């Protein structure tokens, strides 16, 4: 009887351990086992994300997702997402990660896990030549606007309120394309966008020929992160190493040249700070 009891206990323990091992699998394991990486990308934010003439997703963020899927040994699935829906798509499990040029704010970090920065943006004023705007200070008392849920929208609206000029106003738009179109059509006098977006928009030929950069915006460098579920530390650690490898292998510089242009790719660290 004792031998049978010991055998029963051993079998139960083995089953318990097996169950614990199975339950210990995390998001990274699940992605690899599924054979697919669902990656959210904002596809109206060239050159980071857009669609080509055949409606295929293209851009820096798209290539970044493809690179990540390749090293994971899975197939990439690009999920077109708006700026406002990046984190909701993640927390509702519609995507596995977000490569949507998402600013690494402390507020967002309450909801989503963030990698070390994989890209960094500087901001400029986008306007039309006939609006006679040559610097950021010229936006005081002007109708301006920006894309909802973006870093630059929050900063610009805050300044409009601080200026407290009765002639000034701020409008929100659902997409980046809507914001740029509003500037192009004269619905607003200016907006603030990344330098990459500004030059890509002017170069595209899709908008009014008077579209131009009206100086730099005095915003801090916008460091952006890959997003993963907040408690999935195994996946977040993997993303951190992946970003580091992209830089060390020269792939980051290669993608920058391909999608943005010649010149040095932005540094991904605050000087004197170890992220």
Which residue stretches match the model-derived regions?
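Flexible hinge/capping segments at coil-to-helix
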Residues: 127-144
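A ligand-binding cleft/hinge motif common to bilobed small-molecule-binding domains
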Residues: 102-110, 155-159, 184, 189-220
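Extracytoplasmic small-molecule ligand-binding "clamshell" domains
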Residues: 25-101
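A structural signal for short loop-to-beta-strand junctions that line the ligand-binding cleft
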Residues: 28, 60-61, 108-118, 212-216, ...
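Ligand-binding cleft/hinge of the Venus flytrap
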Residues: 65-74, 152-172, 202-207
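Periplasmic-binding protein-like
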Residues: 119-127, 205-241, 262-275
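Beta->alpha turn/N-cap motifs
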Residues: 40-45, 79-84, 93-105, 121, ...
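Short helices/loops that flank or line small-molecule/ion binding pockets
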Residues: 70-71, 79-80, 84-98, 111-113, ...
């Amino acid at each position: 009887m004792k031998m049978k009891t010991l055998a029963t206990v051993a079998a139960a323990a083995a089953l318990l351990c097996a169950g614990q091992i199975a339950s210990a699998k995390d998001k990274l394991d699940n992605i690899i086992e599924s054979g697919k990486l669902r990656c959210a990308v904002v596809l109206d934010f060239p050159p980071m994300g857009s669609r080509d003439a055949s409606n295929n997703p293209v851009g820096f963020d798209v290539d970044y997702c493809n690179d990540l899927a390749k090293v994971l040994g899975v197939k990439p699935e690009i999920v077109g997402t708006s700026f406002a829906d990046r984190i909701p798509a993640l927390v509702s499990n519609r995507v596995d990660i977000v490569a949507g040029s998402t600013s690494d704010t402390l507020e967002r970090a309450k909801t989503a896990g963030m990698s070390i920065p994989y890209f960094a943006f500087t901001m400029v004023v986008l306007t039309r030549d006939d609006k006679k705007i040559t610097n950021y200070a010229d936006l005081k008392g002007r109708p301006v606007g920006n894309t909802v849920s973006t870093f630059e929208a929050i900063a610009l609206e805050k300044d409009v309120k601080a200026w407290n000029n009765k002639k000034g106003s701020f409008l929100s738009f659902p997409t980046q394309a809507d914001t740029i179109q509003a500037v192009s059509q004269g619905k607003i006098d200016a907006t603030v966008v990344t330098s990459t977006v500004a030059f890509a928009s002017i170069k595209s030929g899709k908008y009014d020929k008077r579209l131009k950069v009206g100086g730099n915006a005095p915003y801090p460098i916008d460091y952006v992160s890959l997003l993963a579920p907040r408690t999935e530390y195994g996946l977040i650690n993997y993303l951190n190493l992946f970003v580091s490898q992209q830089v060390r292998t020269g792939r980051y510089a290669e993608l920058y040249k391909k999608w943005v242009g010649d010149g040095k790719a932005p540094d991904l660290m605050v000087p004197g700070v170890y992220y």
